């Protein structure tokens, strides 16, 4: 019986790599997969999922207006789909998460979603909120902070490397960069206004 999966993590935990490996595992057995990624994120080129270790795969794009259930139903009528995989699933709307649950429940196609749980403010993305609520299986993909603890938070740094937690939730292609850290060092960095100073102190412990 098909299920809806949500693989979630902080940034740079290998979500895209895990998605590409799952897709490959299906294809290796002669099964057909359909891969989606968010139209909003084209850092590695539009229409593909790319991992930091150099793997990539063509992908369909979704935006807030994409009717995922109708697209997948039409596609599966033409040719059997054995699995749907969604990268950057934090950018899904509530309705799209519901549509993916319909793909599972009505079309009996497994759906594997990969995404961030929280944003740089420590708040849930809408897509992640409903995936956490409605998925059959939740899997945390772990990465570590510079201190060795599990990294569960994402810091946004400005062009001068200073952490901040105000502004738009989604900024693609700006001068900002993001770093995954543990909760303690997320709070410490925001309080001090510097991640570098905290990292330097930690090196000398």
Swiss-Prot record:
EC number(s) stated in the UniProt entry for this protein: 2.7.1.21
InterPro entries noted in UniProt: P-loop_NTPase (IPR027417), Thymidine_kinase (IPR001267), Thymidine_kinase_CS (IPR020633)
Catalytic reactions of this protein: thymidine + ATP = dTMP + ADP + H(+)
Cellular localization per UniProt: Cytoplasm
Domain of life: Bacteria
Matching SUPFAM superfamilies: Glucocorticoid receptor-like (DNA-binding domain), P-loop containing nucleoside triphosphate hydrolases
Ligand binding (Zn(2+)): 145, 147, 182, 185
PROSITE patterns noted in UniProt: TK_CELLULAR_TYPE
Subcellular location, principal: cytoplasm
GO biological process entries: DNA biosynthetic process; thymidine metabolic process
Binding site for ATP: 9-16, 87-90
The protein's assembly and partners: Homotetramer.
Protein name: Thymidine kinase
Species classification: Bacteria, Pseudomonadati, Pseudomonadota, Gammaproteobacteria, Enterobacterales
Gene of this entry: tdk
């Amino acid at each position: 019986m098909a299920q809806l999966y949500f693989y979630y993590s902080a940034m740079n935990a290998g979500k895209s790599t895990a998605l590409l490996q799952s897709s490959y595992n299906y294809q290796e057995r002669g099964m057909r997969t359909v891969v989606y990624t968010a139209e909003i994120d084209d850092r590695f080129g539009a229409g593909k999922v790319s991992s930091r270790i150099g793997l990539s795969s063509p992908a369909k794009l979704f935006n807030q207006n994409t009717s995922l259930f109708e697209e997948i139903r039409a596609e599966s009528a033409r040719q059997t789909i054995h699995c749907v995989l969604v990268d950057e699933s934090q950018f899904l709307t509530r309705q799209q998460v519901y549509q993916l649950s319909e793909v599972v429940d009505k079309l009996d196609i497994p759906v594997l979603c990969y995404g961030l749980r929280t944003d740089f403010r420590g708040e849930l993305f809408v897509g992640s909120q409903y995936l956490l609520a409605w998925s059959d299986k939740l899997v945390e993909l772990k990465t570590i902070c510079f201190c060795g603890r599990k990294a569960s938070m994402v810091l946004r740094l400005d062009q001068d490397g200073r952490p901040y937690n105000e502004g738009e939730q989604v900024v693609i292609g700006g001068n900002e960069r993001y770093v995954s850290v543990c909760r303690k060092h997320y709070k410490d960095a925001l309080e001090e206004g510097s991640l570098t100073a905290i990292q330097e102190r930690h090196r000398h412990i």
